[in-house]
Amino acid sequence: SQMEPLKKLLTLLGYRLVTCEGFEADDILGTLAKACEENGNECVIATGDRDSLQLVSDKTSVHLCSNKQDILYTPEKILEAYGVTPKELIEIKAIQGDTSDNIPGVAGIGPKGAGDLIQRYHTVEYIYDHLDELEIKDGVRKKLTASKENAILSRMLGEINCNAPVDTNVENYV
């Protein structure tokens, strides 16, 4: 595997490697970002993974790197780009799903439909608690009803766990 020589090189260069059995890299990043915030520090996460955008806050920004462009996301930039708050990105993903992360979502509702629902109603929980009262098309209501379990599971799967049991002493990473 190419990972072992890379890990060795990063260690020799003075970088600290953090792993945690049963947790994904996103969870570790989220946990460390939360620790930075709790210590009054600002945090910038450099990644190519859009899932990290849910971690954006007043103290944490995400530098999303790709072949096409690099964008620094702040809460304002996410609102401008997606029309929702960073935490609401989790809700959108729960409805639209994400095949790359094995998140099923609601069958038949894509990014635009999911974005519209969350811009209006903000959370999956609210949508299902008020499904009969929402001003939505019957077809959308039927899709939501048929995929309720998937949507709730997708909401849980899509949220980064910011409580991974890793060393959160920020001083140990400087």
Language-model-detected regions and their locations in the chain:
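Extended two-metal-dependent nuclease catalytic cores across DNA- and RNA-processing enzymes
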Residues: 1-168
